[in-house]
């Protein structure tokens, strides 16, 4: 009923203009269809509905309010409210208006034109803007744009340019700036060219100096670029920020390892005797197929960069494992050891630190249990892919290595399975993937979530990202992604709360195939020589006395 009261108020605003001269009916659609009162007087309601009021409308507050009220009025009619009841209520609403003249006008409008308006509402429930145009509360979009252009021409002022409209065409011209397709018709003056080159080199030098001397400069620059991303609109803004997060660090590193002259030559501000080789530009129609509509996310770090850091990771891992072995010998508590591992993980670079923390949270107790049974620390670093495996140790520690590898999220090649004793390691088999393609789409979706969600995200945040994540994948994957999320959402949500490693998550829920894997069993005698030979009692219990005498105790 509140909606009807608001509708009555809008009717007063729209229809209290003076009665028009009958000659106005010959003035054409623009005049006849300016409001419902004129259209009724000229008997042109149907004509106005078809030719004028049904056209797109400009966005405005009165128009939006009117559309809401008309929609609510239509809902009341659907609830079987009679026209007499609505008319009586509107007349009572008019009586509440304090201004006596407005109250009388309101009642006159309701009595005279409400049946026409209600008929329009019944017939055009899907387009409330048509009714609001008849009430002169919504303006035609075509008319609005024409008025704007005319006003700009008459003002004789230079309009302010929206930066967001300038950025996009500028970005599209960057390839032509880097690799011009045609030589300039006239060579620039040497002096001017030298000035531009010197200015470019000075700018790059100043930026490099600021990066070295001011620790907050890079972050400030990144924040400034993200502010510019906000001006690109809701859809492009998130993609822009995602690119900045992925590639800003790599871009700064590249700039710091290049000479200013080299950078300025690349962007075309400085000349070089040996010209920079030009790349063949891909036509825009072809390039956009690879970039849009999905802007596929890629890892910001190349594989060879990670491999170059493996030596450092290996040394750090060996140092940490040796220290933990010493603490175990000194009877340190498990809580103290876990804290020590967590601190060690935090000292690693970002990619390795995140992986280290995930492995620690999920499998920390199992790793410590293996260390307590005198497994070589260097070998342990090998099986978690931070060091190259030592071939001399593989033969003697094959079973515990297989157990550790199966507990880690990363899946190396499965080890050879030894002959199973009566009590052996538990066997687990991941069911084959369903629908033949969920493995690939699962990994792409988890990669998207990994890049766009903060660490320790809540279930609600992960669920919201899942619901819209499929729309950011390439077209061939979107339908399949929707089916995948619909089928696996509950299980996927439970795992993503704990870990977001694509290979681990997709294997865990069973959409990516995997070989039989050995899991760390409850029977300790399957842990291998590191456990069998710790003392004679354990060796006897595991039937390994002869083995320990030949290979360990000699």
Curated annotation (Swiss-Prot):
Saposin B-type domain ranges (all copies): 59-142, 193-274, 310-391, 435-516
Summary of subunit composition and partner proteins: Saposin-B is a homodimer. Prosaposin exists as a roughly half-half mixture of monomers and disulfide-linked dimers. Monomeric prosaposin interacts (via C-terminus) with sortilin/SORT1, the interaction is required for targeting to lysosomes. Interacts with GRN; facilitates lysosomal delivery of progranulin from the extracellular space and the biosynthetic pathway.
Protein name (database record): Prosaposin
Carbohydrate-modified residues: 80, 214, 331, 456
Function (record text): Saposin-A and saposin-C stimulate the hydrolysis of glucosylceramide by beta-glucosylceramidase (EC 3.2.1.45) and galactosylceramide by beta-galactosylceramidase (EC 3.2.1.46). Saposin-C apparently acts by combining with the enzyme and acidic lipid to form an activated complex, rather than by solubilizing the substrate. Saposin-B stimulates the hydrolysis of galacto-cerebroside sulfate by arylsulfatase A (EC 3.1.6.8), GM1 gangliosides by beta-galactosidase (EC 3.2.1.23) and globotriaosylceramide by alpha-galactosidase A (EC 3.2.1.22). Saposin-B forms a solubilizing complex with the substrates of the sphingolipid hydrolases.
Major localisation: other
A cellular-component GO term for this protein: extracellular space
Record key words, sorted: Disulfide bond, Glycoprotein, Lysosome, Repeat, Secreted, Signal
GO BP terms, alphabetized: adenylate cyclase-inhibiting G protein-coupled receptor signaling pathway; antigen processing and presentation; cellular response to reactive oxygen species; ceramide metabolic process; cerebellar Purkinje cell differentiation; cochlea development; corneocyte development; cornified envelope assembly
Name of the gene encoding the protein in the UniProt record: Psap
Propeptide: 17-59, 143-193, 274-309, 390-434, 517-554
């Amino acid at each position: 009923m509140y909606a009807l009261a608001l509708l009555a108020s809008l009717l007063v605003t729209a229809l209290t203009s003076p009665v028009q001269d009958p000659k106005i009916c010959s003035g054409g659609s623009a005049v006849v269809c300016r409001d419902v009162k004129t259209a009724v007087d000229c008997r042109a309601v149907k004509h106005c509905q078809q030719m004028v009021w049904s056209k797109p409308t400009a966005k405005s507050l009165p128009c939006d309010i009117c559309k809401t009220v008309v929609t609510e009025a239509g809902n009341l009619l659907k609830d079987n409210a009679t026209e007499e009841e609505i008319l009586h209520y509107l007349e009572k609403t008019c009586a509440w208006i304090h201004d006596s003249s407005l109250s009388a006008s309101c009642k006159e409008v309701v009595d005279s034109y409400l049946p026409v308006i209600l008929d329009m509402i019944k017939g055009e429930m899907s387009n409330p803007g048509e009714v609001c145009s008849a009430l002169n509360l919504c303006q035609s979009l075509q008319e609005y744009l024409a008025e704007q252009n005319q006003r700009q021409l008459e003002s004789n002022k230079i309009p302010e340019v929206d930066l967001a409209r300038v950025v996009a065409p500028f970005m599209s011209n960057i390839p032509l700036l880097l690799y011009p397709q045609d030589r300039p018709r006239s060579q620039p003056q040497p002096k001017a060219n030298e000035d531009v080159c010197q200015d470019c080199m000075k700018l790059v030098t100043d930026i490099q100096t600021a990066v070295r001397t001011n620790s907050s400069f890079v972050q400030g620059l990144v924040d400034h670029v993200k502010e510019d991303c906000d001006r690109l609109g809701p859809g492009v803004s998130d993609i822009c920020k995602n690119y900045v997060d992925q590639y800003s660090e790599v871009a700064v590193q590249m700039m710091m390892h290049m000479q200013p002259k080299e950078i300025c030559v690349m962007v075309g501000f400085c000349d070089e005797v040996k010209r920079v080789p030009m790349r063949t530009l891909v036509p825009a129609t072809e390039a956009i197929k690879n970039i849009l509509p999905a802007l596929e996310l890629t890892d910001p770090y190349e594989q060879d960069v990670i491999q170059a850091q493996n030596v450092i990771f290996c040394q750090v891992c060996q140092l940490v494992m040796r220290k933990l072995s010493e603490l175990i010998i000194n009877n340190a508590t498990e809580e103290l050891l876990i804290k020590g591992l967590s601190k060690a993980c935090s000292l690693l670079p970002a990619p390795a630190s995140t992986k280290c923390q995930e492995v620690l949270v999920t499998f920390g107790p199992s790793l410590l249990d293996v260390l307590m049974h005198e497994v070589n620390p260097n070998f342990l670093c090998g099986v978690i892919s931070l060091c190259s495996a030592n071939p001399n140790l593989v033969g003697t520690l094959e079973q515990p290595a297989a157990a550790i590898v199966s507990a880690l999220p990363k899946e190396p090649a499965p080890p050879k399975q030894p002959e199973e004793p009566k009590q052996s390691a538990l066997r687990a088999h991941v069911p084959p993937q369903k629908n033949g393609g969920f493995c690939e789409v699962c990994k792409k979706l988890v990669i998207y979530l990994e890049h766009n969600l903060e660490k320790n995200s809540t279930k609600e945040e992960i669920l919201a990202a899942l619901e819209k994540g499929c729309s950011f994948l390439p077209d061939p994957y979107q339908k399949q992604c929707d089916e995948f999320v619909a089928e696996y959402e509950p299980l996927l949500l439970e795992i993503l709360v704990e870990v977001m490693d694509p290979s681990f998550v997709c294997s865990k829920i069973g959409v990516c195939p995997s070989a039989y894997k050995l899991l760390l069993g409850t029977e300790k005698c399957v842990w291998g020589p590191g456990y069998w030979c710790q003392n004679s009692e354990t060796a006897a219990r595991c039937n390994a006395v002869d083995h320990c005498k030949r290979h360990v105790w000699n």
